[in-house]
Amino acid sequence: MTERRVPFSLLRSPSWEPFRDWYPAHSRLFDQAFGVPRFPDEWSQWFSSAGWPGYVRPLPAATAEGPAAVTLARPAFSRALNRQLSSGVSEIRQTADRWRVSLDVNHFAPEELTVKTKEGVVEITGKHEERQDEHGYISRCFTRKYTLPPGVDPTLVSSSLSPEGTLTVEAPLPKAVTQSAEITIPVTFEARAQIGGPESEQSGAK
C-alpha cells in the first residue's frame, strides 16, 4: 500500500460542543506538551495534599516527617508529576460511523506537523528546531502511530487543527452490511395443458 500524506485544515473557531464551557479542556485531554518545564512548586504542593486515589499520592516522607520533609520532597514530587502529565496521552473516540483521534500539539506550528497514512496506520509527526523561550533553548519532536479500524478507506482520512492547538484526525467507518429480513417465497404449481381441449377444437375448426 502506498504512503499518503493527509493535509489538515485550520479551524478559525473551535467546533461547537454542548457543555464545552462547563469544564476545562484539560479534563478531556491530558497535557501533551512534550518537553515543557516542570510545574510550579505550589501546584505540586496542592496535588500532594489532595492525594487523589488511583492517580498520584504524596510521597511517604511528606506525610510522615512533617512540613520540613514536604519542602525537601517537593522538587522530586513535582518532577514525577510532570512526567505523568506530559506523557503524551491522546484521546481516541469511535462512534457507530466515525473514528477520531485528538492530540494536543499547541507547541507546534502548522508547518511543523505531518499527518500521513501507510499500510492501515496513521502517523502523526511534529518537529521544530532548537529555539529560545523564557526558560532557555529547547527543541521538540514526537511521532505517534494509530492503527485504523478494519475496512477504513485511508484516502478518506482527514485532519484539522483548532485554534487551541488540538489536532483532530478522523475517518468514516465502513457501513455494516445489514442482513435482509427473511422472506418465504410461495411455490406455485402450473396445471398441464389439456390435449383436445376447447382451444384445440377451435383451432381445428379453422
Swiss-Prot record:
Query: Which positions carry N6-acetyllysine?
Result: K127
Family matches, as CDD domains: ACD_HspB1_like
Keywords associated with the record: Acetylation, Chaperone, Cytoplasm, Cytoskeleton, Methylation, Nucleus, Phosphoprotein, Stress response
Assembly description? Homooligomer. Homodimer; becomes monomeric upon activation. Heterooligomer; with HSPB6. Associates with alpha- and beta-tubulin. Interacts with TGFB1I1. Interacts with CRYAB. Interacts with HSPB8. Interacts with HSPBAP1.
Q: What does this protein do?
A: Small heat shock protein which functions as a molecular chaperone probably maintaining denatured proteins in a folding-competent state. Plays a role in stress resistance and actin organization. Through its molecular chaperone activity may regulate numerous biological processes including the phosphorylation and the axonal transport of neurofilament proteins.
Family (UniProt): Belongs to the small heat shock protein (HSP20) family.
Q: What is this protein called?
A: Heat shock protein beta-1
Query: What is the scientific name of the source organism?
Result: Rattus norvegicus
